[in-house]
């Protein structure tokens, strides 16, 4: 009987420690779920939900556009095409999306620019009634097509992954799906891939087997240019499947490309080499002149000398839509983003002014 109090005390301590551990685990799970929900809220386009444009859907092609007789034609993709991909169900492209495609079409007048949209893959013969599609019809080198994921991934290591991924919930599925699409497109067709938050300043056709450097530690696949069936892209597809992790942001995208490039070049640091075995990683200024941490610079005024420097040293500007979306842009201001729209997607820029 005298030992009862000490036993009870030990039992109480054990129970309390288990409760504290359980509370800690519960708090961790709640925080994880909250961060995932916050991510999805951030990545939604606030302007894409029910936005109504005042302009009529029929757009007059007022600006000079590429000549149709110099444009690649044919029913299927061909080597050298420029690709954009929309992996969500959205079929109401916003201003930045439209500027991306328009700037690519203008800088590549003799090249087919293919816009693949998952939301169109439902058997409809006609495009949705939207000003963006009317504007794209002004460019004879632009083709809007449904994104058939089963067909795209067929015959690649990504086919089995895609079927399995559809049967489970993943926090970053859409970005990962986009990562998969770009390497599948590069493997099957080759050509140029661009994210829909790029503004293209120059023709990219002289770049082959090239990707861009985001920072001194990481490469980025928002721009890719490769010949079809390239061994580097094949290794990317294998790494995608063998080292798959859907819970780490960027693991299947920038980090994947960085891993594969280091193995490809047999290096431990990106500073050791920027080109080897026929594959090149261009310096940050070529495609990512403004770091994602400095995204607010797009909304700040720039001098003519700064703009001239950018035009001379950069192929295309990545706007980091995940950060910039929802931020109000004074379209007639001297802000960098407004000037980029004015110079490289004037038709989209005019519509932005009329709707501002």
Label every model-predicted segment:
Residues 2-178, 196-356:
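Glycosyltransferase-associated regions of secretory-pathway enzymes
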Residues 179-189:
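Small-residue hinge/turn detector
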Residues 191-193:
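Short aromatic/hydrophobic "clamp" motif used to bind/position activated sugar donors
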């Amino acid at each position: 009987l005298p030992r009862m109090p000490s036993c009870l005390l030990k039992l109480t301590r054990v129970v309390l420690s288990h409760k504290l551990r359980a509370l800690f685990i519960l708090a961790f799970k709640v925080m994880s779920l909250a961060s995932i929900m916050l991510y999805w809220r951030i990545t939604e386009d606030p302007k894409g939900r029910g936005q109504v444009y005042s302009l009529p859907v029929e757009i007059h092609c007022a600006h000079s556009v590429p000549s149709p007789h110099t444009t690649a034609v044919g029913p299927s993709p061909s080597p050298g095409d420029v690709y954009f991909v929309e992996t969500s169900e959205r079929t109401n492209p916003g201003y930045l999306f439209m500027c991306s495609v328009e700037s690519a079409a203008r800088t590549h007048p003799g090249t087919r620019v293919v816009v693949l949209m998952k939301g169109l893959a439902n058997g409809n013969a006609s495009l949705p009634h939207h000003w963006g599609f009317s504007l794209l019809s002004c460019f004879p080198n632009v083709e809007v097509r449904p994104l058939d994921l089963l067909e795209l991934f067929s015959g690649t290591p990504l086919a089995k992954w895609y079927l399995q991924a559809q049967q489970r919930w993943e926090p970053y599925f859409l970005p990962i799906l986009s990562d998969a699409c770009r390497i599948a497109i590069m493997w099957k067709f080759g050509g140029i891939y661009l994210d829909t938050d790029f503004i293209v300043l120059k023709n990219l056709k002289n770049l082959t087997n090239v990707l861009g450097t985001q920072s001194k530690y990481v490469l980025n696949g928002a721009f890719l240019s490769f010949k079809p069936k390239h061994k580097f892209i094949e290794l990317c597809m294998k790494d995608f499947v063998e080292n798959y992790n859907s819970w780490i942001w960027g693991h299947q995208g920038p980090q994947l490309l960085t891993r594969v490039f280091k193995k490809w070049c047999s290096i431990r640091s990106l500073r050791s080499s920027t080109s080897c075995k026929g594959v090149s990683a261009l310096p940050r200024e070529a495609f990512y002149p403004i770091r994602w941490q400095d995204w607010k610079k797009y909304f700040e005024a720039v001098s003519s000398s700064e703009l001239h420097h950018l035009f001379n040293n950069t192929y295309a500007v990545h706007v980091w839509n995940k950060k910039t979306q929802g931020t109000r842009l004074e379209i007639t201001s001297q802000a960098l983003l407004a000037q980029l729209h004015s110079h490289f997607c004037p038709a989209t820029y005019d519509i932005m002014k009329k709707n501002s």
